[in-house]
Amino acid sequence: MKEDFTYDVIVIGAGHAGCEAAHAAARMGVRTCLITMDMNKIAQMSCNPAIGGIAKGQIAREVDALGGLMGEVTDAASVQFKMLNRSKGPAMWSPRAQCDRVKYSLTMRRRLENTPNLQIWQDEVSRIEKRNDNIFELRTLWGATFQAKCIVLTAGTFLNGLMHVGRQKVEGGRCAEPSSKFLTKYLEMAGLKSARMKTGTPVRIDSRSVHFENLKEDVGEVDFHRFSFVSEQRVLPQMKCWTVQTNAEVHEVLRRGLPDSPLYNGQIQSIGPRYCPSIETKLVTFPDREQPPLFL
């Protein structure tokens, strides 16, 4: 039997935005396809495995109010919940949940696989053309051809992605994952301008190497909080986070390493994120701070 690769909507990229876009389109009753380079990395939590935070928590709950998946999946994968900014008025409170990143990805994939009108295809889009009948034709790296009335691009960091680890530069969308160079090329040929944005990813630490007796516990809230109005109870056991403060010895190590930092050796033309700076940025921006905190 010949596979029908004709859809009303095709979503390219299965990160958080792509998952919500594909789910929303399918629930509207249109034939939808979600194309991703790796089905095992759907809704991958690449950075800090958390949902919410100041301002972002309100957005996550608005997505839930509009019928999205993020809130329900977060509640299913949450291992610690906190309501931030409680020292301010209720309008400033912001929910945040630390999540099991593997559980989050698997739960999102399962929800999408059980959504009517939605199919998932693992491949890389290499070419997009618009025919005279206003139908888009997509070709993939592995030779498949798709047709769609509408295309939603949610490629995130994969469009001509470049990763920096110290002085080393490697093409890719995430560690050990290739960037989408072909798609970027054809978007530029279609007249779209490309630019480069920056994000940073914290290191992963083996918990077996941490002396927790020297750290301060950072516990979550014991009463049940949730992101989705649909969720009824916590699913996973709640875990502790930890805080630690740096000292003069650590600061000296960081200063010696500044020539290897892409933000400070000219490799990256950016000032970095405002509210989530790297530890070396804290050192440079706030030199008078003797013990800035770190969170594990």
Kindly give the residue locations of the regions a language model identified:
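Beta1/beta-strand and adjacent pyrophosphate-binding region of the FAD-binding site
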Residues: 3-17
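Short hydrophobic core segments
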Residues: 12, 145-156
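A generic local secondary-structure boundary/capping motif
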Residues: 23, 141-143, 282-286
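Short, hydrophobic/aromatic-rich segments at coil-to-beta transitions
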Residues: 132-137
